[in-house]
Curated annotation (Swiss-Prot):
<dbReference type="InterPro" id="IPR000093">
    <property type="entry name" value="DNA_Rcmb_RecR"/>
</dbReference>
<dbReference type="GO" id="GO:0006310">
    <property type="term" value="P:DNA recombination"/>
</dbReference>
<keyword id="KW-0863">Zinc-finger</keyword>
<keyword id="KW-0227">DNA damage</keyword>
<dbReference type="Pfam" id="PF13662">
    <property type="entry name" value="Toprim_4"/>
</dbReference>
<keyword id="KW-0862">Zinc</keyword>
<dbReference type="GO" id="GO:0006281">
    <property type="term" value="P:DNA repair"/>
</dbReference>
<feature type="domain" description="Toprim">
    <location>
        <begin position="83"/>
        <end position="178"/>
    </location>
</feature>
<dbReference type="Pfam" id="PF21175">
    <property type="entry name" value="RecR_C"/>
</dbReference>
<keyword id="KW-0479">Metal-binding</keyword>
<comment type="function">
    <text>May play a role in DNA repair. It seems to be involved in an RecBC-independent recombinational process of DNA repair. It may act with RecF and RecO.</text>
</comment>
<keyword id="KW-0233">DNA recombination</keyword>
<dbReference type="InterPro" id="IPR015967">
    <property type="entry name" value="Rcmb_RecR_Znf"/>
</dbReference>
<dbReference type="GO" id="GO:0008270">
    <property type="term" value="F:zinc ion binding"/>
</dbReference>
<dbReference type="InterPro" id="IPR006171">
    <property type="entry name" value="TOPRIM_dom"/>
</dbReference>
<feature type="zinc finger region" description="C4-type">
    <location>
        <begin position="60"/>
        <end position="75"/>
    </location>
</feature>
<protein>
    <recommendedName>
        <fullName>Recombination protein RecR</fullName>
    </recommendedName>
</protein>
Length: 201
């Protein structure tokens, strides 16, 4: 059994940090030590910011985004084309698409993908909210931007089937060769998807 070398408060900090995605036990220890060394400049402001976020952050009742207002900043932005909705798995995907800056449209966060093996069904996701948004009218296109996994494909098909008959165009992201990618380094699935999604030049 390993000897304890720190007090319970530091151990608790390490254990909580280890629960953050991307941080394992070793990275959590490093992060904790860094925070402790920078108590005044970093730990105090971080604790304050986390407290404020805990008190103020809400889940948008319209799209599922996280913000301090409900409806969120994206849903209330009149400069966005609200007739187009990009459907994503998680808020991190919404943020990634916003960083790309390709389109100024609305979003809908599902909160995951259908996965019967993991016990995740349609009622566990924000799919009904999407169907309700479309049924209200004013939406002309749904862009499904879920990951190219089995669960993502299943979710995309489920959504497409349930939007049929609502008079909305349903598209999905093209999958294929990344910008700057070399064909020799791509897997067969990516190459096949790129060939199917080919475009005129």
């Amino acid at each position: 059994m390993a000897k304890r070398v720190t007090g319970p408060e530091i151990e608790k900090l390490i254990q909580l940090l280890a629960k953050v995605p991307g941080l394992g036990p070793r990275s959590a220890r490093r992060a904790a030590l860094h925070l402790i060394k920078k108590r005044e400049q970093l730990m105090g402001p971080l604790a304050l910011a986390m407290g404020e976020a805990h008190a103020k952050v809400k889940i948008c009742s319209c799209c599922g985004n996280v913000d301090t207002i409900d409806p969120c900043t994206v849903c209330t932005d009149e400069r966005r084309d609200q007739s187009m909705i990009i459907v994503v798995e998680d808020v991190s995907d919404l943020w990634a698409l916003e960083r790309a800056g390709a389109m100024n449209v609305a979003y809908h966060v599902l909160g995951g993908t259908l996965s019967p093996l993991d016990g995740v069904g349609p009622d566990d996701l924000n799919i009904k909210g999407l169907i309700d948004r479309v049924a209200k009218g004013g939406v002309r296109e749904i862009i499904i931007a879920v990951n190219a996994t089995v669960e993502g494909q299943t979710t995309a098909h489920y959504i497409t089937d349930h939007l049929a008959g609502l008079g909305v165009k349903t598209t999905r992201l093209a999958h294929g060769v990344p910008v700057g990618g070399e064909l020799d380094y791509l897997d067969e699935g990516t190459l096949s998807a790129a060939l199917r999604a080919r475009t005129l030049i």
